[in-house]
Amino acid sequence: MTANAPITQDVMTLPRKLPEGGPVNIVGLTREELLAALVAAGTPERQAKMRAGQVWQWVYHWGVRDFAQMTNLAKDYRALLAEHFAIVLPEVVTRQISADGTRKYLIRIAGGHEVETVYIPEEGRGTLCVSSQVGCTLTCSFCHTGTQKLVRNLTAAEIVGQLMLVRDDLGEWPERGAPKDETRLVSNLVLMGMGEPLYNFENVRNAMKVVMDGEGLSLSRRRITLSTSGVVPEIARTAEEIGCQLAISFHATTDEVRDILVPINKRWNIRTLLDSLRDYPRLSNSERITFEYVMLDGVNDTDADARRLVKLISGIPSKINLIPFNEWPGAPYRRSTPERIAAFADIIYKAGYASPIRTPRGEDIMAACGQLKSATERARKSRAQIAAETGL
C-alpha cells in the first residue's frame, strides 16, 4: 500500500464517438441523449420520441445489434440509422466458470484496456458484479484491484455493455413470438467490481438510467446496489439522481485502522461518512444501508470492534455483511477464523442488526470479493496492455 496514494482523480473517459468521424454508439445513451441524437441525424422532431422508443426496445429488450433487424421501422429509416449510429459492445476475451457456477469474464474495452465482470448464480436469483473503472485509485490494502493503478473511467456504454454481454452468454434475451418468461437469470446488479463508482459518477448514473428503464433491461432500482468506499460529496447525489441501494465498504471501527485499510478515510473519516449516510434511506426511498466488513485476522475482528460497530451505526437503518477475507497472491492479511467470524456476527445480531456471513464464491478462479484484477496486470504484459499504457 502507498501511504500517500491520491484519493481524488482527474482521469480520462473516452469520447462516445467511434473512430474519427465514425457513427455514434447507441449503447449507453440515456433516452434523452438518444432522442437528441436521432433528431440531429435527421429524424423529424414530431417522430423522434416514438422512434427513440422503438430503437430502445430493439436494443435493450430484444438484444438486437443490427438495424436491419428492426422490422417495425421503414427500410429507409433503418438505412439512416446504420449510416449515423452503431451498436457496439466490449469484447469478451476469456470466460472462466468456477466449480460453484460463478462465471468470471475478462472484457476488453476501447484502447485495449481490460476489466473483469462476475456473474454469481444462486437459487432464485443471479447477481452480476460490474466494474466502473480500469484499476482503482483508492489503494485499499486488502483489495487486489487496489494494487492495479487507475487507468481510466469506463463509459456508460462500457458499463451497460457488461450486462448485455453476460445476457448474451446466458442466452437471456427473449425470443420474439415465444411465450413471455418472467424468469431472470440476471436479477440483481452490484457495482462492486473494479473501481470506485462515485469517482465516475456521471457515467455510472447514466448507465443505471439505461439499466433501470422499464422498457429495456428493466432492473428495478431496489435490485441494484452501488458500493462506495465513502466518497462523501457524492452520496446525497447518488440518492437523488440514481436512487439505488447503497453499500459502504466500511471494514474498520476506528480511524486509525480504517486509514490503513481504506485510505480515503484520511479525507472523509468515519464520523463524516456516517453523518452523510443518515438521510440516504429517505432521499433514495431505500429501506436500509449495507455496511460491508471484511474479516481480517487480528486486525478488525475483536469483540470490541463488533461492539464499536453497533454503536457507530446506531440510528442508521442498516445491515452488516461480514465478508471472510478472500486471499490473493501476496496479500498482507489472513482470513479470520470461522469461530471468530461467528462470534463477531453474534454480537451484531444480538444488538438487533442482520449480520449475514457472505459465502465466498468463485475463489478457485479469483472471482471472489476483493480478488478482481485485470489478467494482463496479474501476468505478463500483453500487446493490449502495452498499447493501453502508451495511450493507443
Curated annotation (Swiss-Prot):
Cofactors named for this entry: [4Fe-4S] cluster
PROSITE patterns: RADICAL_SAM
SUPFAM superfamilies: Radical SAM enzymes
Chain residues that bind [4Fe-4S] cluster: 136, 140, 143
UniProt cross-references to InterPro entries, sorted A to Z: Aldolase_TIM, Methyltransferase_A, RlmN_N, RNA_MTrfase_RlmN, rRNA_lsu_MTrfase_RlmN/Cfr, rSAM
Residues at the active site: 116 (proton acceptor), 369 (s-methylcysteine intermediate)
Domain Radical SAM core positions: 122-364
Reactions it catalyzes: adenosine(2503) in 23S rRNA + 2 reduced [2Fe-2S]-[ferredoxin] + 2 S-adenosyl-L-methionine = 2-methyladenosine(2503) in 23S rRNA + 5'-deoxyadenosine + L-methionine + 2 oxidized [2Fe-2S]-[ferredoxin] + S-adenosyl-L-homocysteine; adenosine(37) in tRNA + 2 reduced [2Fe-2S]-[ferredoxin] + 2 S-adenosyl-L-methionine = 2-methyladenosine(37) in tRNA + 5'-deoxyadenosine + L-methionine + 2 oxidized [2Fe-2S]-[ferredoxin] + S-adenosyl-L-homocysteine
Alphabetical GO biological process terms: rRNA base methylation; tRNA methylation
GO terms for cellular component: cytoplasm
GO molecular function annotation: 4 iron, 4 sulfur cluster binding; metal ion binding; rRNA (adenine(2503)-C2-)-methyltransferase activity; rRNA binding; tRNA (adenine(37)-C2)-methyltransferase activity; tRNA binding
EC number assigned by the record: 2.1.1.192
One Pfam family this sequence matches: RlmN_N
Domain of life: Bacteria
Its biological purpose: Specifically methylates position 2 of adenine 2503 in 23S rRNA and position 2 of adenine 37 in tRNAs. m2A2503 modification seems to play a crucial role in the proofreading step occurring at the peptidyl transferase center and thus would serve to optimize ribosomal fidelity.
Family: Belongs to the radical SAM superfamily. RlmN family.
Protein name: Dual-specificity RNA methyltransferase RlmN
Organism of provenance: Cereibacter sphaeroides (strain ATCC 17023 / DSM 158 / JCM 6121 / CCUG 31486 / LMG 2827 / NBRC 12203 / NCIMB 8253 / ATH 2.4.1.)
Gene label: rlmN
